[in-house]
């Protein structure tokens, strides 16, 4: 079909409505007839996954969580309720978790286990 054909001379496409003299085409000049390709790449199928997505762990939100770590006594003095981790890499303000038999630092893994007599 003519609408899918293109004439090319010297690397340029010849436009409709112009003559060969406009492009300075002489006798014995070579013209290339090229078919125009329409469309793009083939449509890809959507991936189907065999395993369901892993459900991420949601951290429990506790309102005013700071109240667990400090207490203000009658005189107005602030008392720390949790033990701070003494490890240098944790830094100040890193509290250890209170368990029934031990204190545990979640940052560095340092654990203090209670003696049976305590």
From Swiss-Prot:
GO terms for molecular function: mRNA binding; structural constituent of ribosome; zinc ion binding. One of its GO terms (cellular component) is cytoplasm. Keywords: Cytoplasm, Isopeptide bond, Metal-binding, Nucleus, Ribonucleoprotein, Ribosomal protein, Ubl conjugation, Zinc, Zinc-finger. There is a cross-link at residue 40 (Glycyl lysine isopeptide (Gly-Lys) (interchain with K-? in acceptor proteins)). The keyword rRNA-binding does not apply. There is a cross-link at residue 12 (Glycyl lysine isopeptide (Lys-Gly) (interchain with G-Cter in ubiquitin)). Residues 1-40 form the Ubiquitin-like domain. It comes from the Eukaryota. A zinc finger (C4-type) spans 85-108. GO terms for biological process: translation. The keyword Protease does not apply. PROSITE patterns: UBIQUITIN_2. Ubiquitin is generally synthesized as a polyubiquitin precursor with tandem head to tail repeats. Often, there are one to three additional amino acids after the last repeat, removed in the mature protein. Alternatively, ubiquitin extension protein is synthesized as a single copy of ubiquitin fused to a ribosomal protein (either eL40 or eS31) or to an ubiquitin-related protein (either RUB1 or RUB2). Following translation, extension protein is cleaved from ubiquitin. In the N-terminal section; belongs to the ubiquitin family. In the C-terminal section; belongs to the eukaryotic ribosomal protein eS31 family. PANTHER family: UBIQUITIN (PTHR10666). This is Ubiquitin-ribosomal protein eS31 fusion protein. It comes from Asparagus officinalis (Garden asparagus).
């Amino acid at each position: 079909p003519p609408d899918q054909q293109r004439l090319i001379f010297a690397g340029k496409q010849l436009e409709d409505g112009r003559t060969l003299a406009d492009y300075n085409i002489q006798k014995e000049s070579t013209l290339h007839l090229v078919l125009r390709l329409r469309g793009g790449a083939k449509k890809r199928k959507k991936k189907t996954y065999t395993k369901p997505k892993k459900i991420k762990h949601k951290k429990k939100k506790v309102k005013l969580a700071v109240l667990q770590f400090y207490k203000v006594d009658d005189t107005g003095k602030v008392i720390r309720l949790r033990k701070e981790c003494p490890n240098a890499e944790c830094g100040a303000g890193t509290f250890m978790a209170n368990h029934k038999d031990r204190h545990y630092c979640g940052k560095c893994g340092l654990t203090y286990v209670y003696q049976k007599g305590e």
